[in-house]
Amino acid sequence: MSYFYRLKLMKEAVLVKLPFTSLPLLLQTLSRKSRDMEIKNYSSSTSGFILLGLSSNPQLQKPLFAIFLIMYLLAAVGNVLIIPAIYSDPRLHTPMYFFLSNLSFMDICFTTVIVPKMLVNFLSETKVISYVGCLAQMYFFMAFGNTDSYLLASMAIDRLVAICNPLHYDVVMKPRHCLLMLLGSCSISHLHSLFRVLLMSRLSFCASHIIKHFFCDTQPVLKLSCSDTSSSQMVVMTETLAVIVTPFLCIIFSYLRIMVTVLRIPSAAGKWKAFSTCGSHLTAVALFYGSIIYVYFRPLSMYSVVRDRVATVMYTVVTPMLNPFIYSLRNKDMKRGLKKLQDRIYR
């Protein structure tokens, strides 16, 4: 019996012995291999990117879609309600609530830049984003996110003036000054985003176009570049320190001054009242900056895909979803504004 004939018989025997129950597993494996080959072919033949998302497990895609859809709707509806509630109640027409209404608007924009594309990718096979779409997402993500941080700093300054210098509050925090603070926050944030996107657009991308994240963030995209990214990484770290740390230090300084002033108040009731006006804002600051500091303020060599995804979900989805509850649950003025809005709707 020839060698080739014996080899043919052995192959047929193996096929006969293959259990029928293993066929679905075999088909699933072949399908996955085919999909992986399609992704590799796509990434090597176009200028687009593949977003791997939160998980590559096909069985988790629909549950994750449902979870993030609910979180997005809660964030959108909650922040949308905050804005008319503030503007419908004249007693909420103060600098603090002016900044809060704009923070709610920025939170809506911030989550909308990320989550809708994320939801589409949960139900998609290839999870494609174009090169221009990736840069656009990066630009608006940073613009709205940085504006959020400056608005949180503006709210801290408002509390500082209200508690430490109440007699000059109306002069310092008059509407014109508040509007200038808002315009300054937006201008600095958009200039920062433009600079970052121009820097990223100069990078070259070779074989792999697969981003190990659920959106186009700076560090995952830098990881893909076949250019020398040492200078880009240094510039990114430096200007990130300038843009993000500056409002954070402003918040820290404001609350240190507030703490010193409050501790000098003789009555316990007065101390509690002063601290209670800052509690919700401090909670929002801790949620927002805690995850941002973890994600951005460490070297690229320490980048971890899983931990970064979890931390990024915290400040891109969870914090905007929780902010309306944080600012309204223990706030009598906001509760009154929401009640007045409800009465107008159902009148």
From Swiss-Prot:
<keyword id="KW-0675">Receptor</keyword>
<dbReference type="Pfam" id="PF13853">
    <property type="entry name" value="7tm_4"/>
</dbReference>
<feature type="glycosylation site" description="N-linked (GlcNAc...) asparagine">
    <location>
        <position position="41"/>
    </location>
</feature>
<feature type="transmembrane region" description="Helical; Name=7">
    <location>
        <begin position="310"/>
        <end position="329"/>
    </location>
</feature>
<dbReference type="GO" id="GO:0004984">
    <property type="term" value="F:olfactory receptor activity"/>
</dbReference>
<dbReference type="InterPro" id="IPR000276">
    <property type="entry name" value="GPCR_Rhodpsn"/>
</dbReference>
<feature type="disulfide bond">
    <location>
        <begin position="134"/>
        <end position="226"/>
    </location>
</feature>
<feature type="transmembrane region" description="Helical; Name=3">
    <location>
        <begin position="138"/>
        <end position="157"/>
    </location>
</feature>
<dbReference type="GO" id="GO:0004930">
    <property type="term" value="F:G protein-coupled receptor activity"/>
</dbReference>
<feature type="topological domain" description="Cytoplasmic">
    <location>
        <begin position="257"/>
        <end position="273"/>
    </location>
</feature>
<feature type="topological domain" description="Cytoplasmic">
    <location>
        <begin position="158"/>
        <end position="176"/>
    </location>
</feature>
<keyword id="KW-1133">Transmembrane helix</keyword>
<keyword id="KW-0297">G-protein coupled receptor</keyword>
<feature type="transmembrane region" description="Helical; Name=2">
    <location>
        <begin position="95"/>
        <end position="116"/>
    </location>
</feature>
<dbReference type="GO" id="GO:0007165">
    <property type="term" value="P:signal transduction"/>
</dbReference>
<dbReference type="GO" id="GO:0005886">
    <property type="term" value="C:plasma membrane"/>
</dbReference>
<feature type="transmembrane region" description="Helical; Name=6">
    <location>
        <begin position="274"/>
        <end position="296"/>
    </location>
</feature>
<keyword id="KW-1015">Disulfide bond</keyword>
<feature type="topological domain" description="Cytoplasmic">
    <location>
        <begin position="330"/>
        <end position="347"/>
    </location>
</feature>
<dbReference type="InterPro" id="IPR000725">
    <property type="entry name" value="Olfact_rcpt"/>
</dbReference>
<dbReference type="InterPro" id="IPR017452">
    <property type="entry name" value="GPCR_Rhodpsn_7TM"/>
</dbReference>
<feature type="topological domain" description="Extracellular">
    <location>
        <begin position="1"/>
        <end position="62"/>
    </location>
</feature>
<feature type="topological domain" description="Cytoplasmic">
    <location>
        <begin position="87"/>
        <end position="94"/>
    </location>
</feature>
<keyword id="KW-0325">Glycoprotein</keyword>
<keyword id="KW-0807">Transducer</keyword>
<feature type="topological domain" description="Extracellular">
    <location>
        <begin position="297"/>
        <end position="309"/>
    </location>
</feature>
<keyword id="KW-0552">Olfaction</keyword>
<protein>
    <recommendedName>
        <fullName>Olfactory receptor 1L6</fullName>
    </recommendedName>
</protein>
<feature type="transmembrane region" description="Helical; Name=4">
    <location>
        <begin position="177"/>
        <end position="195"/>
    </location>
</feature>
<feature type="transmembrane region" description="Helical; Name=1">
    <location>
        <begin position="63"/>
        <end position="86"/>
    </location>
</feature>
<keyword id="KW-1003">Cell membrane</keyword>
<keyword id="KW-0716">Sensory transduction</keyword>
<feature type="transmembrane region" description="Helical; Name=5">
    <location>
        <begin position="234"/>
        <end position="256"/>
    </location>
</feature>
<feature type="topological domain" description="Extracellular">
    <location>
        <begin position="196"/>
        <end position="233"/>
    </location>
</feature>
<comment type="function">
    <text>Odorant receptor.</text>
</comment>
<keyword id="KW-0812">Transmembrane</keyword>
<keyword id="KW-0472">Membrane</keyword>
<comment type="similarity">
    <text>Belongs to the G-protein coupled receptor 1 family.</text>
</comment>
<feature type="topological domain" description="Extracellular">
    <location>
        <begin position="117"/>
        <end position="137"/>
    </location>
</feature>
